[in-house]
């Protein structure tokens, strides 16, 4: 179709990692011990193995419409898209110590957990999946190349907030610019090549967490206990971390205003921006209790503000060209709060 362009992109990254570890019997000199030698640890050789597979899949589907109207005075670009991201990991670990009198040899061909004493076997595993889905739209418009507008909207969903009812969140941005040097009243200023005033406001989110299921209560092994007559050993379990069924997206609101200019036949470029960013529902760790690993909560609000400036000079002298640049950034950080009801 005329004025339309469709783009589909797909990528996949698969990684497989496996390894083996051998722990020999370690002996150290000790002149106070019999034979002047002390054996460290259990005094048994040990082997361990692990295998880990990780998959990452990204897909993007973008439909773009581009057109100009009224002899090129009105220029429009509109994009609609759908993106997905999937990440999964699976890991299995195992270890065994030697049997009585059966030393595991220091030979990589024999470093397998099946060679050790089955009574000393230990194992563990890790498995998780994460998915992000986004629907987005963007519009870019300019009138005669001097009045510039853009706007975007996206709806993001993340499996990090599964079971909370807060999987989906909307975000948007608006921006505008004025290329003043395209105005008739600026044409007589010969040393000023370009001057643009710009401003924008937008929101975005963060769902990056160091665990896959922060809202779900996961159990891990703990100390065993003995009960009853005859005595029976019961395995113990504890919460791996404090689950949070109310967890939601971290949200960032940001706005900035500034200008860009080129002078002296475009040799000198300068730009300055004042910005302010406020992060709400900050994802942070909740202090652990009773020995548990800290959980994750939306605990605070942080505000950043400052100025960004950059300047560059570029020139040509005969066949020799050179450029010089410098930049300056200031930031004022303020923690507005680090508290939430219930903590």
Which residue ranges define each predicted feature?
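Extracellular/periplasmic, surface-exposed regions of secreted and cell-surface proteins
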Residues: 1-23, 34-343
């Amino acid at each position: 179709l005329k004025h339309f362009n469709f783009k589909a992109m797909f990528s996949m990254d698969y990684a497989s990692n496996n390894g083996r570890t051998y722990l020999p019997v370690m002996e150290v000199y000790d002149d106070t011990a019999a034979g002047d030698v002390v054996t460290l640890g259990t005094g048994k050789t040990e082997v361990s193995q692990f295998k880990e597979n990780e998959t990452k899949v990204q897909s993007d589907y973008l439909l773009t419409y581009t057109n100009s109207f009224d002899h090129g005075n009105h220029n429009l670009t509109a994009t609609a898209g759908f993106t997905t991201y999937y990440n999964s990991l699976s890991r299995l670990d195992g270890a065994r110590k030697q049997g009585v009198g059966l030393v595991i040899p220091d030979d990589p061909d024999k470093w397998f957990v099946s060679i050790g004493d089955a009574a000393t076997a230990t194992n563990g595993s890790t498995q998780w999946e994460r998915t992000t889905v986004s629907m987005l739209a963007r519009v870019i418009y300019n009138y005669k190349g001097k009045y510039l507008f853009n706007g975007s909207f996206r709806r993001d969903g993340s499996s990090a907030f599964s079971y909370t009812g807060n999987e989906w969140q909307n975000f948007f941005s608006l921006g505008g610019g004025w290329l003043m040097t395209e105005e008739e009243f600026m044409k007589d200023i010969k040393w000023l090549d370009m001057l643009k005033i710009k401003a924008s406001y937008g929101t975005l989110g963060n769902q990056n967490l160091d665990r896959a299921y922060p809202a779900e209560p996961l159990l891990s092994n703990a100390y065993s206990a003995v009960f009853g007559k005859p005595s029976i050993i019961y395995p113990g379990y504890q919460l791996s971390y404090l689950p949070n069924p109310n967890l939601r997206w971290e949200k960032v609101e940001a706005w900035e205003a500034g200008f860009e200019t080129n002078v002296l036949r475009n040799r000198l470029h300068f730009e300055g921006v004042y910005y302010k960013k406020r992060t709400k529902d900050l994802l942070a760790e909740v202090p652990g209790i009773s020995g548990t690993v800290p959980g994750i909560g939306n605990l605070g609000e942080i505000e950043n503000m400052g100025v960004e400036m950059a300047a560059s000079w570029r020139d040509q002298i005969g066949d020799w060209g050179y450029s010089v640049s410098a930049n300056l950034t200031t930031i004022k950080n303020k923690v507005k709060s680090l508290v939430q009801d219930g903590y």
